[in-house]
Amino acid sequence: MLRAALPALLLPLLGLAAAAVADCPSSTWIQFQDSCYIFLQEAIKVESIEDVRNQCTDHGADMISIHNEEENAFILDTLKKQWKGPDDILLGMFYDTDDASFKWFDNSNMTFDKWTDQDDDEDLVDTCAFLHIKTGEWKKGNCEVSSVEGTLCKTAIPYKRKYLSDNHILISALVIASTVILTVLGAIIWFLYKKHSDSRFTTVFSTAPQSPYNEDCVLVVGEENEYPVQFD
């Protein structure tokens, strides 16, 4: 009975633990490192990259930016296995003519790139970047796209959750762990008490004092006393 009851006791607590460490806006987002990602699979017609970007900003995010090889690999793997995205994904990048460099829309630093070999002599005005899913490389292309088959968005874990949630998560984990331990101990104590009580009741019943005489003996004795034997 105790073993069968434990899963029912633990499942709600495990659900609370999962909720305590969830940092992304909803279950449709996927967390990796310090960011959350969502792939909007709806195909839309666009007039500029800003239309694509608006798809992300409407969800409180921005177009994808990539900052290391691990993140690039994560996006490729997730697009192939879970999101089922198109062959090329538009990156949240634009060419800044002021200093002749590519920059991310989310204003993060350009710390990593994976450009494929291309001729850089061409005019880069109105040039955007695409992630090629089959190779994982980035390639340059015209920003004047007429449609996109999906938009990949990214948002950072909120500051409050990222930097202040460690203590909250620790406290929540301790509370949950304590609750689990107390629940299990309570169930064990109850089980042992119930078992001991049943055993004690059985023992008391089986060892109750029994009369040395049965009813027949009592009757016989009574009869003997009622008619005493007379001696001459």
Curated annotation (Swiss-Prot):
Subcellular location: Membrane; Cell projection, Filopodium; Cytoplasm, Cell cortex; Cell projection, Microvillus
Annotated signal sequence range: 1-22
Chief place of localization: membrane
A GO term, aspect molecular function: carbohydrate binding
Tissue specificity remark: Expressed at moderate levels in monocytes, myeloid blood dendritic cells and granulocytes and at low levels in plasmacytoid blood dendritic cells, monocyte-derived ma crophages and monocyte-derived dendritic cells, with no expression detected in T-lymphocytes, B-lymphocytes and natural killer cells (at protein level). Expressed widely in different tissues, with highest expression levels in liver, lung, peripheral blood leukocytes and spleen, and lowest levels in neuronal tissues, skeletal muscle and ovary.
Start and end residues of each C-type lectin domain: 32-152
Classification via InterPro entries: C-type_lectin-like, C-type_lectin-like/link_sf, C-type_lectin/snaclec_domain, CTDL_fold
The record's account of how the chain is modified after translation: May be heterogeneously N-glycosylated in some cell types.
Residue spans, topological domain Cytoplasmic: 190-232
Entry membrane topology: Single-pass type I membrane protein
Glycosylated residues, chain numbering: 109
GO cellular-component term (any): microvillus
Keyword entries, A-Z: Cell projection, Cytoplasm, Disulfide bond, Glycoprotein, Lectin, Membrane, Receptor, Signal, Transmembrane, Transmembrane helix
Transmembrane segments: 169-189
GO biological process per UniProt: phagocytosis
UniProt topological domain (Extracellular) ranges: 23-168
Disulfide bridge positions per record: 128-143
Pfam families noted in UniProt: Lectin_C (PF00059)
PANTHER family, per database record: MANNOSE, PHOSPHOLIPASE, LECTIN RECEPTOR RELATED
Role: Potential multifunctional C-type lectin receptor that may play roles in endocytosis and phagocytosis as well as in cell adhesion and migration.
Further details from the record: Isoform 2 and isoform 3 are produced in HRS cells by a transcriptional control mechanism which cotranscribe an mRNA containing LY75 and CD302 prior to generating the intergenically spliced mRNA to produce LY75/CD302 fusion proteins.
Protein name: CD302 antigen
Origin organism lineage: Eukaryota, Metazoa, Chordata, Craniata, Vertebrata
Gene that encodes the chain: CD302
